[in-house]
Amino acid sequence: MMRIGLFLLTNLAVLVVFSIVFGILSSVFGLGSVHGAGGLNIASLAVMCAVYGMIGSMISLFLSKWMAKRSTGTVVIEQPRNASEQWLVETVAKQAKAVNIDMPEVGIFDNAQPNAFATGWNKNKALVAVSSGLLHTMTPDEVEAVLAHEIGHVANGDMVTLALIQGVVNAFVMFFARIVGSFVDRVVFKNEDGPGIGYFVTSIVMDILLGFLASAIVMWFSRQREFRADAMGAKLAGRDKMISALNALRPAEARPDQMPENMQAFAISSGQTQGFSIANFFRSHPTLDDRIEALKKYTPGQS
């Protein structure tokens, strides 16, 4: 639950900061003429929200590989130092060739919890990394399946897709928050002289409330991408290997997630939530049981 709370607070903090900056630029400098004598200029507001909503997501996307390396301490394998590293590089190269993408960077990060992630702004400029814990606890067949899962994320363009979705929902949040803020300012506070305290306070409050809904939407898309990456893992490595790899993650799922907050949506697993919980709406990954059940229904050739 702490992981989910931190994730939501981070996203909401970003929205609030954008809200404050947006308010200063539009009211003090008149940027975009969002506020006019008759109230909000809806067209200008829509354009400005779209721009501001996408900026943060695009910056995060382009910095994703650099941030991932720093936050996880990933060491890229420039020249394999042992048979294990050589096998990792060769396996990723084989899988990348199978899905027709350029060879990603391959790295290892020091973490006792078995995990892995893929990131990068472009499918041909990606990074695939595995934890030391994964290499120590999984069999070669299971590691192969995990790598295939991550290559699936890269080949499917999941990093770009989630960044675009986050940008779109951020834009909608900012847009509707300001619509409500303007309504409250004019109708409740009877302010006809431009944006007042009612507008700014209401906009920030609505940013927070709508931000929760936006996070749930983004996480729903994230869960769907996990199913697709699992299917790619089954296609490249074999269904039995993929199921075995997911089963091998069960002990780790019972422990708190050790991945940095900004990387949890791109890892192969996240903390487990038993039974129904509101927290399930904010999970970046489906439960292992759901993922394994989907794989059992998978047939070769299925996308």
UniProtKB/Swiss-Prot annotation:
Leader sequence range is none
Q: What is its main location?
A: membrane
| GO MF, one example | zinc ion binding
Report the active site residues. 150
The enzyme's E.C. designation: 3.4.24.-
| Sections of the chain in a coiled coil | none
Q: Name one GO biological process term.
A: proteolysis
Q: Which Pfam families match?
A: Peptidase_M48 (PF01435)
On cofactor binding, the record's note says:
Binds 1 zinc ion per subunit.
Query: Where in the cell does this protein reside?
Result: Cell inner membrane
Its Gene Ontology cellular component terms are: plasma membrane
Quick check: keyword Membrane in the entry?
Answer: yes
Residues bound to Zn(2+) are: 149, 153, 226
* Domain of life where this protein originates: Bacteria
Q: Which cofactors does this gene product need?
A: Zn(2+)
Membrane topology category: Multi-pass membrane protein
Keywords from the named record:
Cell inner membrane, Cell membrane, Hydrolase, Membrane, Metal-binding, Metalloprotease, Protease, Transmembrane, Transmembrane helix, Zinc
Matching InterPro entries: HtpX_protease, Pept_M48_protease_HtpX, Peptidase_M48
Check the record and name the PANTHER family matching this protein: PROTEASE HTPX
What family does the entry list? Belongs to the peptidase M48B family.
Give the protein's recorded name.
Protease HtpX
Q: Which organism is it from?
A: Psychrobacter sp. (strain PRwf-1)
- Upper lineage: Bacteria, Pseudomonadati, Pseudomonadota, Gammaproteobacteria, Moraxellales
